[in-house]
Amino acid sequence: MKASELRNYTDEELKNLLEEKKRQLMELRFQLAMGQLKNTSLIKLTKRDIARIKTILRERELGIRR
């Protein structure tokens, strides 16, 4: 997901999306441990999405506009 797309979400929607992405990352890690995960790059992409969401939430908290 692109940061420009995420900036259109409200804070509450971003927080919900963050929780969803964290759950998704946990599931991916379990699948990796069990040997069921075929596409390991999904872990990397999910971590990046989490970082983007946290960055946007922090920008709003500090009042930084982009």
Swiss-Prot record:
GO CC, any one term: cytosolic large ribosomal subunit
GO terms, biological process? translation
Pfam families listed in its UniProt record:
Ribosomal_L29
Which PANTHER family does the entry mention? 60S RIBOSOMAL PROTEIN L35/50S RIBOSOMAL PROTEIN L29, LARGE RIBOSOMAL SUBUNIT PROTEIN UL29C
Keywords (alphabetical) are: Ribonucleoprotein, Ribosomal protein
The molecule here is called Large ribosomal subunit protein uL29
What GO MF annotations does this protein's record show? structural constituent of ribosome
> In its keyword annotation, does this UniProt entry include Ribosomal protein?
yes
User: Which family is it part of?
Assistant: Belongs to the universal ribosomal protein uL29 family.
**Protein's gene:** rpmC
**PROSITE patterns to which the protein is assigned, alphabetical:** RIBOSOMAL_L29
Q: Which Gene3D superfamilies match?
A: 1.10.287.310
